């Protein structure tokens, strides 16, 4: 079995089945999703705790990224996508017709596999979302930029070149810049879709350390193909297979004493 970070082993596991409303960031209820005639998610239900890191793992094509993109309605951009079920944020179904999708995406930020800074300065990348919200006071923008860059553990590396083009940063720095941009508008939830898959090992470690710090302020949900990464950074892990949620428990349980045979087979490398 995969070794677990000692900090994760020392933490008391959360009772996910009886998680209270005040400790729940998101609740997914009986979620089905299909693209045209092909069903990609089958009756997924789970509660995601506040200010914890929850990892989605599973083989390619299992539905983990599809599920992640449901949480801020990115799948709305796919014309053939049909969804049944609910995802509750503050007790409200985010798929309710009355929901302001733009406001939802401000509250549920997302970072993708490859760093995607805008062709602007480092500073303008960070404050971009704030400007869209109508914030133009220079002092407020400066404070927000520094706060966000510090929060993404990159301030010391860029503080003397904030007006340089963001494309001049390394891949790992660009990804931290993108995280800074996401947290600048102070979301409650941060979705990370394979955030280190395009990075070198040193940059990956830096991002992993950042993820464990981010949960002090945000609920973090990460999709990863790297099981060692899930074991290192997450508090809970959900194992998905062929569109179904097979097992969801504290990370220590998933990686050391899984309850389901499919989970054990995947963790031990029998398939995947």
UniProtKB/Swiss-Prot annotation:
InterPro entries linked: AAA+_ATPase, ABC_transporter-like_ATP-bd, ABC_transporter-like_CS, P-loop_NTPase, PstB-like
Keywords from the named record: ATP-binding, Cell inner membrane, Cell membrane, Membrane, Nucleotide-binding, Phosphate transport, Translocase, Transport
Domain of life: Bacteria
Enzyme Commission identifier(s): 7.3.2.1
GO BP: any one term: phosphate ion transmembrane transport
Gene3D superfamilies: P-loop containing nucleotide triphosphate hydrolases
PROSITE patterns listed in its UniProt record: ABC_TRANSPORTER_1, ABC_TRANSPORTER_2, PSTB
Binding site for ATP: 58-65
CDD domains in UniProt: ABC_PstB_phosphate_transporter
Membrane topology qualifier: Peripheral membrane protein
Reactions mediated catalytically: phosphate(out) + ATP + H2O = ADP + 2 phosphate(in) + H(+)
Molecular function in Gene Ontology: ATP binding; ATP hydrolysis activity; ATPase-coupled phosphate ion transmembrane transporter activity
Keyword Transport in record: yes
Domain ABC transporter: 26-267
Family, similarity comment: Belongs to the ABC transporter superfamily. Phosphate importer (TC 3.A.1.7) family.
Assembly, per entry: The complex is composed of two ATP-binding proteins (PstB), two transmembrane proteins (PstC and PstA) and a solute-binding protein (PstS).
Function: Part of the ABC transporter complex PstSACB involved in phosphate import. Responsible for energy coupling to the transport system.
Protein name: Phosphate import ATP-binding protein PstB
Originating organism: Shewanella denitrificans (strain OS217 / ATCC BAA-1090 / DSM 15013)
């Amino acid at each position: 079995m995969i070794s677990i970070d000692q900090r994760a082993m020392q933490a008391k596991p959360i009772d996910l089945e009886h998680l209270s409303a005040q400790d729940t960031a998101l609740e997914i209820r009986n979620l089905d999703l299909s693209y045209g005639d092909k069903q990609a998610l089958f009756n997924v239900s789970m509660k995601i705790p506040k200010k914890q890191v929850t990892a989605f793992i599973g083989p390619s094509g299992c539905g983990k990224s599809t599920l992640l993109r449901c949480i801020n309605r990115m799948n709305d951009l796919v014309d053939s996508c049909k969804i049944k079920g609910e995802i509750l944020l503050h007790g409200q179904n985010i798929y309710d017709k009355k929901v302001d999708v733009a406001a939802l995406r401000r509250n549920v930020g997302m970072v993708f596999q490859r760093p995607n800074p805008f062709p602007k300065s480092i500073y303008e990348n960070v404050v971009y979302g704030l400007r869209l919200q109508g914030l133009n006071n220079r002092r407020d923008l400066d404070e927000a930029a520094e706060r966000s860059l510090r929060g993404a553990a990159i301030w010391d590396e860029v503080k003397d070149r904030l007006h340089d083009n963001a494309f001049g940063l390394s891949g790992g720095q660009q990804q931290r810049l993108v995280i800074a941009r996401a947290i600048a508008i102070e979301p409650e939830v941060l979705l990370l879709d394979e955030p280190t898959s395009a990075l070198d090992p040193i940059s990956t470690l830096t991002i992993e350390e950042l993820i464990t710090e981010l949960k002090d302020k945000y609920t973090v949900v990460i999709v990863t193909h790297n099981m060692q990464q899930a074991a290192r950074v997450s508090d809970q892990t959900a194992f998905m297979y062929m569109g179904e949620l097979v097992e969801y428990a504290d990370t220590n349980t998933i990686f050391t004493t899984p309850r389901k045979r499919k989970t054990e087979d995947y963790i031990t490398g029998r398939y995947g």
